[in-house]
UniProtKB/Swiss-Prot annotation:
Keywords associated with the record: ATP-binding, Coiled coil, Metal-binding, Nucleotide-binding, Zinc
Family matches, as Pfam families: DNA_pol3_delta2 (PF13177), DnaA_N-like_STI (PF23007), DNAX_ATPase_lid (PF22608)
Chain residues that bind Zn(2+): 491, 500, 503, 506
UniProt name for this protein: Protein STICHEL-like 3
Ranges of Polar residues composition bias in the record: 10-20, 126-136, 993-1003
Coiled coil: 742-770
Family: Belongs to the DnaX/STICHEL family.
Amino acid sequence: MTTTTTTTTRVASSSSTRNNRILKDANGDIGEHLRNHIHLTNCIHLKNNMHKQSPVLTDRALMRDLIVLQRSRSLRDPSASPPAWNTPPSVVDLLPKKGDLVEGGRRSVDLKKSSRRLSALSGSSPVVNFGTSKVTPSDERSGPVSGERDSGRRVKREESSRKSYRIGDDYQNVNEVVSHGSGSKASRRLSRVNDAMVKTLSDQLNEVVVGDSDDVVSSNVRPRVRYGGGGGGGNTRGCAGGMSRPKRRKFRGTRRVRGKSRDTGGGKSEMSVASNTLPQVEKHDGEKEGFGEQNMTKACGIPFNWSRIHHRGKTFLDKAGRSLSCGMSDSKGGRKGETNERNGSDKMMIQSDDDSSSFIGSDGEALPLLVDSGENDGWVHDYSGELGIFADSLLKNDEDSDLASEGRSGEKKHKKKSHVNARHRHRQQHQSLTEKYTPKTFRDLLGQNLVVQALSNAVARRKLGLLYVFHGPNGTGKTSCARIFARALNCHSMEQPKPCGTCSSCVSHDMGKSWNIREVGPVGNYDFEKIMDLLDGNVMVSSQSPRVFIFDDCDTLSSDCWNALSKVVDRAAPRHVVFILVCSSLDVLPHVIISRCQKFFFPKLKDADIVYSLQWIASKEEIEIDKDALKLIASRSDGSLRDAEMTLEQLSLLGQRISVPLVQELVGLVSDEKLVDLLDLALSADTVNTVKNLRTIMETSVEPLALMSQLATVITDILAGSYDFTKDQHKRKFFRRQPLPKEDMEKLRQALKTLSEAEKQLRVSNDKLTWLTAALLQLAPDQNYLLQRSSTADTGGRESSDHHLDPSSDAAGGRSSGLDRRRGDSRKNRPAVEEIWLEVIEKLRVNGLREFLYKEGRIVSLNLGSAPTVHLMFSSPLTKSTAEKFRSHIMQAFEAVLESPVTIEIRCETKKDPRNNVHHHHHHPTVKDKSLPQSLALIGHDYNIDGSGRSEIVEVTESNGQRRQQQKQQEEERTEPVGSSALARARRKHLEASQSQNQSQSIVRGKVSLAHVIQQADGCSLQNGWSKRKAVSIAEKLEQENLRLEPRSRSLLCWKSSRGTRRKATRLKVRTRRARPHTLLKLVSCGKCLSTRSPTR
């Protein structure tokens, strides 16, 4: 009896000791778990705030700490996960359940219930027996007492293993006391331990939290149990075994290889913590109730295996920033702590799948690590989905980047609570104008009306495609439009237009927590395997909202990625998946992708749209800028709004009003005034000053190609009439007169052509400055170009009109040769001659005469010898005669300019007949003696005020002398023999040529032929085309045939024509025909002749 009482007392005291130690270990685990959370929070805070000071060393060290904490098992809470079917029961299961309360509402340790649980577990559960020593048959027959002894032995081994890493004398002493029952000494030792360990749960928790946490070693390591395949006792190893506890290792960025745990039969695969599903837990109904209540009230709300089972395949940034929802809240949020904690643990209840043991996260969005109260701002980031791939690539290559941390978490900017916005917040880091004014809705997109209309209708009507391609130049809004389109597809609002920006989907995307929108780019920076993991992990997951994948800058995508993407597209065709490819050109995409996608082209933005956007941004940012400066920025951006915004931001940093010279200086341009001065010198053939001015401009570090491009732009503006010459016009020579005359416009067009040809040489040359100088010196045209009018330049085939002089006025050969010499001398100083001619025109006092000379006249040569002589050329005889009338006024103007007597020679341009190459010189020596009306009547023109004339076409009749000469020639033809026909033909040709010349010079009223009408109407003297000559020749042939056949219709066998008809045919001939023999005609008389000679007539 005494022995039984002693044994019962010993067992009770040992059970009390064991329960107290188990309670302390459990409380120590919770306290250490909280300390790890605090440390993780500090690491994340340092990561997001300290990288500005030392972005290399601090980021790398903190990144390593985050990796270690994420992989560490000390962060997992054993109190939040129920025991699995095949997993050994945790020591937390031995704690008191619901209802074990004492006075004051605090928990206490019930030794009897704990001993019952220990005995029940030791007697029933086959998993609890994981001691390292074999159990003898005598021990098995010893009944409950021996079972309790074994339990005590196991608990003490576990306790000793948790307190230290080495197996020493303490473990052996405790083992001896428990196994051999050494009487009163052991009882006294156990009673002292029980008195020291019996404390409440809150007191122990306070002691653990207050105590020093540096030397605390986590004992919450998940046991790894390996079951032997043979019979007898199982050799087990694990954290609760104590004898074979593995040593701790320091993590250096490497992953811990998980050991395989085998089943008792050896046929099952590895047992992971993720297999603790709810259906398996439901088998332990009694244990689940108490455990759930304790989890809801006292735990932090995170299962100890949460970091492994929640959203597999995610990076440590995802796990640290989203999965851990417990943190430190502010003081005002403490009242709602229990409610928020209970709601958070309810949301994080994991749903299981019947066919899989792995957990799948719910569709609800996870919260950030530190959840503040509703008064604080939300998290904002710039990237939604590419960071998952970026972080995986970061871990793989052991790299560091601020993009991963800043893009996922952002940096907080503290505000006053009165200006709090729950969804948006501003970072301390400066935001560029491009980021700050990024379009958020379709309405904000600029200059892409067709694309916006098409995509908006597709969202409203839910007519979605699988593949979209947005292509176009850079800075036109392709990526922004893709993001807006993705947000609109996932928007939950029932109103249009979408996206609304207020629904849960839009808010989650703005906060960076939307998993339905994944953005990847640029693709060339990431691994092919990571992209495939992203596609395989998200495409096949069913979701109510469409999943959108944005591949930005897919120009660098490899062929393997295209092949894999095409396969994924084929598999994802019936699902709610949308792929948006953003590139600059369609040439980089394979034909398989292009044939399946909807293509949207984003053209360059107009300068007016860019100016409007920049003006709006400048008003928002309070930037003082001129309107012309905005136009210059827009013109230099080449249709890219992003480039224009970056230029405006760069100019705003100068801190002064932005003007056009400031923009030109910043972007490396030359002012328009300097460019016009350079062009004026080059076109005026001022070689020395042109070279000096060019070197002065090149000293400002301007590229020769850029300078040539600016010169071409200025010339184009001048030709278009959009350039203003009001500044410094009096100092220039070529651009002195406004508007520019036609000849000067021709010079500018020729200069533009010269610059365009020189640009090709400039691109391939090493000495660009020399080629640019040569091109500018070639802008001054030569003499042939100066003497050639714009009207004659179109013909191309004719020679310059100044080479054909009037032979009647220059009868002497010496005079014409002297004029040629003077003309050659004048070509050397042609710019000076032109300036003198312009000064002469300005000296004229008659306005109509000044206008007339400017349009119709031009100076050919100027001889400033002993007898100064001026040669003037006019386009037509009428203009020449008008100039002769005002000879005195012109002479006075020349004498006023040259300050010496001058002789003026007025000439008319020669005209060339295209048919017979006969030069007609319209020179009338008697014009000087006639008055203007008489002169007009003589040449047969009605002159108008504006200088244009109207010609009257008449037929030339023959004089009496010509008529007698013609009759004599006909008589000779009748009487001459047959052998002299050649001489007769020659005489007739000479006669016809003289008649044709007389016809063109003498003009009287009469009848007209069809050929002459065509010639006069079309300006036969100026024609050189084949079709017009052909039409004239055909008309002449028809006229000749009609005239020859006219008398033959009167009587039969009449081969003679009247003299009048013969004369008409002779005048109209151009090519003479071979004369027919008249031998037969002499023998046979004509019926017409007989009828005329009959006396009856």
